[in-house]
A protein has these predicted regions:
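Short amphipathic alpha-helical leader/targeting segments
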Residues: 156-157, 161, 271, 302, ...
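Nucleic-acid-interacting cores, centered on viral/eukaryotic replication and modification enzymes
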Residues: 108, 124, 128-153, 193, ...
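Amphipathic alpha-helical surface "interface" segments used
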Residues: 163-171, 238, 279-284, 469
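Extended, charge-rich alpha-helical regions
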Residues: 12-15, 23, 183-187, 191, ...
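N-terminal leader regions that mediate targeting or early regulatory function
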Residues: 1-229, 233, 247-255, 388, ...
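Acidic-enriched, low-complexity/disordered segments with a strong bias for Aspartate over Glutamate
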Residues: 3, 41-44, 60, 66, ...
Length: 489
């Protein structure tokens, strides 16, 4: 029967030559395990627009990161301390405990690093195109560094009529703050309102909990303009979580990150003189850079935190700071030996070196999460839908890298796109990797051909950019703007 067909997420070649990265002298013959779709007659090359030779320094480039960096206000930390004893078990159950705890830490940003890495971003593939290969922020990174769940219902799902009553209560509070001295539901006004008002019954405690999660979502997870207020569009999500329903926050947050990186890349290419405001929280991108590029890490994180029992992975980067010159950063980003493919170690799902399916996956949230890490799909955000391409960065997830195939774009409703993400654990099969990942000879040859083919166009584009990159009427710039458009459902 058709409904019994298993979807296999991993392709296997029982005997193939695998290279250790781009070092052609380190080869081995073994079984190769690849994420699908891969190894087709017409592989999907990276976007040529992603390798435009953008100048190393752009003094006139105006980018504001302030809105995307919430810090961790003292009042917020007080609220976490107040509610954690009461709700920690519930947060653990729906998968947000690490995310809430991580929000109590301050993470400093290095704007030079963020701008430099954005220059390598490809909006077409949602990956960074480095000279040595592709890499990206994955769902695993959002789970490990952001503490956000990949499992649960879609963030666009509406609550039931019973739950809707709590949404209405939050709207009333928001209206009250609009009429107060604050004039709007600012973060400080919101938290003070609930810290000063002690709940006297279960309903009051429930509304405070929903208000708390609404602020957490607005500040740290699904931030949208205006950036200094609690957003009413997160009320539906917050109240559903209060009622014990898990929500898939990681794909929503990752979709927003991809969207804003694509917008920032277009801004950089055009050398736009107007100020560009980054709204999506970039904390996780900064942490991703520190995890993946050891030479760009703050030294204090290695020595000061050694041996400490930290509450979350992200906490090792709390309050540390570094400032590097743009040329130093670019050199590190372009070096194939400077990138750590698996900084978190091997997957924690167990069953290494074996195939899993059916009941094994149904019984394990870890296996269900891992399946979403490795499966090409769509990320449904609050206001955008983005492609997710783990098969292009398979080594980050422990798999060998072959030539990636095109993942088809489905122009459909968000519900249909969500069905691609929301897999049925009974109907999937995949392999849990147990060896150091490498690349195939075909991939190395294909990548070299891509790099060679782009060298000529890079030189030509560089000349165009030098002649007048700031002019939006320049025909070369027009071509690049077209190349970097993002498809959004």
């Amino acid at each position: 029967m058709a409904d019994e067909v298993q979807e296999v997420l991993v392709s296997v070649n029982p005997s193939i030559t695998i290279l250790s990265g781009h070092n052609e002298s380190k080869v081995s013959s073994r079984a190769g395990y690849f994420l699908v779709p891969c190894n087709v007659d017409s592989p999907d090359p990276p976007s040529a627009a992603a390798v435009i030779p953008i100048p190393a320094t752009q003094a006139d480039l105006q980018v504001n990161f302030d809105k995307s960096w919430s810090g961790s206000p003292k009042l917020w930390r007080r609220w976490v301390e107040k509610l954690r004893p009461r709700h920690e078990a519930a947060w653990q159950e729906i998968g947000i405990l690490d995310g809430v705890v991580t929000s109590t830490w301050r993470f400093n940003r290095d704007e030079n690093v963020l701008l430099e890495i954005a220059k390598f971003w490809s909006p077409r593939t949602n990956t960074f195109i480095f000279p040595w290969g592709e890499a990206t922020v994955t769902l695993e990174d959002l789970a490990v560094l952001g503490g956000l769940p990949v499992l649960g219902s879609c963030v666009r799902e509406k609550p039931t009529p019973v739950v809707q009553e709590d949404v209405n209560e939050l709207k009333i509070v928001r209206c009250n703050l609009n009429a107060s001295k604050y004039k709007k539901p600012t973060f400080s006004g919101w938290v003070k309102y609930f810290l000063e008002d002690i709940p006297t019954d279960s309903k009051g405690e429930r509304i405070e909990h929903a208000a708390f999660l609404s602020m957490w979502l607005s500040m740290f997870v699904l931030k949208e303009a205006p950036f200094d207020v609690v957003q009413p569009n997160v009320f539906d999500i917050a109240v559903q979580m209060v009622h014990g329903k898990g929500m898939a926050l990681a794909p929503a947050a990752l979709a927003s990150l991809y969207r804003d990186l694509s917008s920032l890349k277009r801004h950089i290419i055009c050398n736009n003189q107007e100020k560009f405001v980054v709204g999506t929280p970039l904390n996780v991108l900064q942490l991703w850079i520190w995890e993946r590029f050891p030479a760009l890490r703050p030294k204090r994180a290695v020595s000061f935190l050694e041996g400490r029992n930290l509450p979350t992975r992200a906490a090792r980067w709390g309050n540390v700071q570094t400032r590097l010159d743009s040329s130093d950063v670019r050199g590190e980003l372009e070096s194939p030996t400077r990138f750590e493919w698996m900084p978190y170690g091997s997957t924690n799902v167990g069953l290494h070196g074996s195939w899993v399916s059916g009941d094994d996956i149904v019984r394990s949230k870890e296996l269900q999460s891992f399946a979403r890490y490795i499966r090409a799909s769509y990320l449904i955000g609050m206001y955008c839908t983005e492609k997710y391409h783990p098969h292009r960065v398979a080594r980050q997830l422990g798999f060998d890298q072959d030539m990636p195939a095109t993942f088809p774009r489905i122009r459909s409703s968000w519900k249909e796109s969500w069905r691609r993400y929301d897999l049925n654990p009974q109907r999937i099969t995949f392999f849990v990797p147990d060896s150091q990942p490498g690349i195939t000879k075909d991939y190395m040859k294909w990548w070299k051909e891509f790099r060679c083919a782009t060298d000529t166009s890079k030189k030509r584009m560089a000349a165009v950019i030098q002649e007048g990159a700031s002019s939006s009427t320049d025909p070369g710039i027009k071509r690049q703007r077209q190349d970097t458009q993002v498809s959004v459902s």
